[in-house]
Every structure is written in structure tokens, then in C-alpha cells.
Design a protein with these regions (language model features):
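Mid-chain, well-packed structural core segment of small domains
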Residues: 7-53
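Short alpha-helical segments enriched in small residues
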Residues: 1-4
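C-terminal binding/interaction regions
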Residues: 33-92
Length: 92
């Protein structure tokens, strides 16, 4: 069991779709550090997906840094969003 994870494929699309099929995983496909920060702050994403064919090494390092250094905001609207996502998982 892990707190966070990082997955990579060619575009990041397929791996993010697959990761989001796993109960409890909230995987965000990010192509820049701003997206990584926002997916952590707003969606409490616990997995980061990136596309190796889409982004270079330096950009990838910036994305990973933003993802790992950002905490969930705990804002009410964001908590409500996470609760709705959890309900969708239970409905499967």
C-alpha cells in the first residue's frame, strides 16, 4: 500500500484510464506543473500519469516535484467532490 504513485506510458492517456479503474485511485494526467499542483489541491489525486512521448525529462521532473510537494486543500467543495467520486466507486 502506498500514499502516491506515478505511472508513465506513451501519451499517459491509456495508463491513466487503467489506473482510475482501481478502487481508491484518483489518477491525474498532467502535462505541466500547474496541472500537477491543481490535481493534488482540488482532486486529492494520489497517482500521477505522464506521457513519455509528450513531455521531456526536465518538464517531467517539474511535474513530479509539483505533484509530490502539493497537499490537498481540504476545501469544502473539494471534499464534496472527493465524496462524490467515492460514491461513484461504490456504485460499481
Amino acid at each position: 500500500e502506498m500514499d502516491r504513485g506515478i505511472v508513465i506510458c506513451g501519451t499517459g492517456i491509456g495508463i491513466s484510464i487503467a489506473a482510475n479503474k482501481i478502487k481508491g485511485v484518483r489518477c491525474g494526467l498532467c502535462t505541466d506543473p500547474v496541472m500537477a499542483r491543481l490535481t493534488r489541491e482540488h482532486n486529492d489525486a494520489n497517482m500521477l500519469a505522464m506521457g513519455a512521448r509528450i513531455i521531456g525529462g526536465e518538464l517531467a521532473r517539474g511535474i513530479v516535484k509539483a505533484f509530490l510537494e502539493t497537499d490537498f486543500s481540504n476545501g469544502k467543495r473539494h471534499i464534496d467532490r472527493i465524496n462524490k467520486i467515492t460514491e461513484l466507486e461504490r456504485a460499481k
